[in-house]
Amino acid sequence: MLVAPDQPFPSSVELVLRRYALLVDARGASALGFEAAVAAMAPATKAAITADLKCFLAWCKSRRPVATAVPAEPETLVHYLHWLAKGSDTRPPAKPATLARRIASVARIHRILGFGEKEPLPTQAGMVRDTLKGIRRKKRERQRQAAPLRFGEAMQNGQAPPEGVTVKALLASCGTDIIGLRDAALISLAYDAGLRVSELVAATVADLRQVGDGSGRLEITHSKTDQLGEGALAWLSGDTMARLSAWLLVSGLSEGPVFRRINVLTGPSDAAGQQIVRHYIGDRPLTRQGVVAILRRRVFEAIDLGHVDLEPGMEGDTVRALSAHSFRVGLTQDLFAAGEDGAGIALALRWSSPTTALRYARELAVGNNAAARVLGRLRDGGGQTARSPPANRDIL
C-alpha cells in the first residue's frame, strides 16, 4: 500500500503500481509524499505517466528473467528503449520524442518512490543517455509539429497574406444554421485566444466577459503550464464576441460548457413537403476528437466552396497536417509576422518559454530572413518582396 488507507479512491498511478507490486520496491516511499506528488500532477500529466508506467512494468514482467522495474538497472532501460524503437507487428516503432517521454516518466516514478536522493537515477546513466542520442541520430527525425492555421491577412508591410487553408477560409465555410454558428464561434475563439484543445473544450459560459469597446475576455482557469490553477485572461476580438453571442443565443445556453455536441434528428416531411429536422444540444463538452472532426469537416467544406486554392491531390495531406493545435501555432506565427517579440508572445499565449514560441515560428522566420529578402528581389524580379511561406503546405 503506497497511499494512506483513508484515501477513498486510489489514483490511476497507484493502481498500476499495485498491479505490478512484485516488480517495484516501494519500501522507502512516503505515503504522504506519494499522495502529494500525484495530486500535484495535471490530469494530462497523470494520464501520460500512468500509460508510460503501465507500458514499462508490463515489459519488465514479460522479460526472462523478470526485470526489476523500480529501482531499474541502466541495462534494463537500454534494452527497453531498443524494444520501443524497434516496434513489432502490432506496435509501430516509437519516435524519439516518445522515447524521451517514456524515460522521463520512469525517472519521475523513481523520484516519487524515494530514489535518486542519495545516488543518481538509473535514467541518468551514460549508457541510457547515449542510447537515446543514438536512436535519435539514426532516425534523424525532427519532432512533428502541427501545420499552422494563420488568419489570412498580411500582417506586415511587404508580406503577402498566407495562402491555402486559413482561419478566414474556415469561417467563410460556416453557414448561419445552428451547427455553422457553433463552428464559427469555436474557430474564432480558438484562434483569438491561441487555445490548447484542453483549454478550448473546458471553456464555460461563465468564463466569457464582454468589455466596453466590444472586445471580450476569456478566463482560462486551468492550462498545461498552470498546474497550480492561478488562471489567466485571454483577449477576444469584437468579431469573436459577436460569433459567441450568436451561438449562445440560438442554442439557449446560459451556463456550462460553451461548445457541445449537436445531435441532428430528421423526421417526416411537413405539410409543405419540407423534411422536419430537429437539433438537440448535449450537456457535456466536446471532446478533443470532436474538435478535430469539426476542423477537418470545415477544411473540406472550405475547399469545396472554393475558399481554398490547393494543388490537385493535396487535399488529404493538407487535412492530415492540421490539428486542433494548428490555431495556436498559426496565431504564434501571425504575431511574429506582425513584429511582436518572443517574450511577449510567450506571455500572451501562455507558452512555457519564449524558446517554445520561437520553435513554432521557425519556418516563418526562414521565409523572411536576410537571404529570403535579398535573393527574393534578385531572383524573382527587381522590387518583388519575398513572400511568406504558405500556411498549409508546411507539412512537418
Predicted regions and their residues:
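N-terminal core-binding DNA-recognition domain of tyrosine recombinases/integrases
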Residues: 33-46, 53-142, 173-176
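Basic, Lys/Arg- and aromatic-enriched nucleic-acid-binding interface segment
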Residues: 161-197
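N-terminal DNA-binding module of tyrosine recombinases/phage integrases
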Residues: 2-36
